[in-house]
Swiss-Prot record:
Modified residues (Phosphothreonine): T271
Start-end of Basic and acidic residues biased regions: 247-259, 484-495
Residue(s) carrying Phosphoserine: S135, S321, S370, S384, S385, S498, S515, S520
Native source organism of the sequence: Sus scrofa (Pig)
Gene: PALMD
Name this polypeptide is given: Palmdelphin
Amino acid sequence: MEEAELVKERLQAITDKRKIQEEISQKRLKIEEEKLRHQHLKKKALREKWLLDGIGSRKEQEEMKKQNQQDQHQIQVLEQSILRLEKEIQDLEKAELQISTNEEAILKKLKSVERTTEDIIRSVKVEKEETSGASIEDIYANIPDLPKSYVPSRLRKERNEGIEDDEQNRKALYAMEIKVEKDLKTGESTVLSSIPLPSDDFKGTGIKVYDDGQKSVYAVSSNHSAAYNGTDGLAPVEVEDLLRQASERNSKSPTEYHDPVYANPFCRPTTPQREKATPGPNFQERIKMKARGLGKDMNGSIHTMNNGLSEERGSSVNHISPIRPIPHPRSMTQQAEERPHSPQKRQMTPWEESDVTQDKCAPSAKSQLSPGEAPVGKSERQGSSPTCQEDEEDVRYNIVHSLPSDVEDTEPVTMIFMGYQRADDSEEEKKLLTGYDGIIRAELVVIDDEEEEGEGEAEKPSYHPIAPHSQVFQPAKPTPLPRKRAEVNPHENTNHKSPHKNSISLKEQEESLGSPIHQSPLDIQIAGDGTEDPSLTALRMRMAKLGKKVI
């Protein structure tokens, strides 16, 4: 009762205080209005006094004096009202201060008498314990057809309150250990691993950072000991995020699957594959005829000139690119496969072979290959007469590697490019050179050992005896094809070489070249001049500087 009275007194004091504050605010507004009127009347009185000095009539002066007296009276009344209002405001402020002091005293008494929330909760619990549950049971007893074993939920809750409050008796249904790494800069938490634990082995060690009645989260350090006491609690959003990351990590499959791979050869993709160097049906026969006369050495370099066109091998397609015939350096050592050659054709000289091929099938101008055509695979398209097809394709020549039989085939052969030699632009030569892609001719230079150098100086001169008239150094007549030479083919570049043993000797070559049948107009012209070839002169000078002799 005392507490209620104190509360009423406090509320009354607050109400009175509020009324006084409103009165004070109204009186202050009224004072402001009175002050404005007082100022206005003062200005009016001064103006009338100034006008009174300029009036000459007596009647008007009397009227002005009466008006001035009235204004002065109003000014005095306003001044008195202003003073009175100010005094009232002071009294109200004193009353407000008195009410405030009384309110503070009532509040102190109320705090001493008023119970705290804990006291109220405690008293409620005591009242519940004192009151018996007979009243609730009486209420449910009046309900018909109610089983005797039925216990109201309120009673069950009250009976189980003590057990629920005891956290040690609460058993965990599921436990999981989650290793979390927290970035101190961004504050983001990343789940490193999650390991489920049996609920029986779980021990609530650590500091509890979250508990909503269904889930409990404990902070444990890396060494499975309790974390430091300064661990902050987790918000429900953070707990849900960690559980989501852990569930996503567990749901990920450890194996990564890819598209099915089929080994069926019919399901092979249509992308271009790298072709293997396997000859076709007529490919090996063509190699037998064209590869004769080439060096067997593994380091020999081959360069084909076809009217300034050279075939180079790409990834899987043959590319034809126009380039100038320039000397290539010695190629890298590669493993080469020896191709079997027919012994009957090996015994034939290149001139006999060319005569035989011309008699069988004379190539026409239309059948010859143009510079832009590729010779690969033409024998497969025309398989009826392979000899004629090979003659048509054999317009392009390779380097002449005709070595004498006494030269060992194990030694490498090196060719030195000494320059070009131009032919006169005559009509007959243009006709003869139709389809002519260019043939490289080289001088055979044998460099002896130093021991044999002294013996050979007395017998052999230091220059070639028939250099101006030698057919080895002059361009041969292109009409009678001397012999089929191996092309630079993507499949023949490094793997097809013919032995030197099948090549004709130098003496036989000079005799065959010296015959009038194979002399070209260029040979006759140079022989008539009696001048030496500039390439031979340069070669002789170079050999003389090296101390070697030229055969």
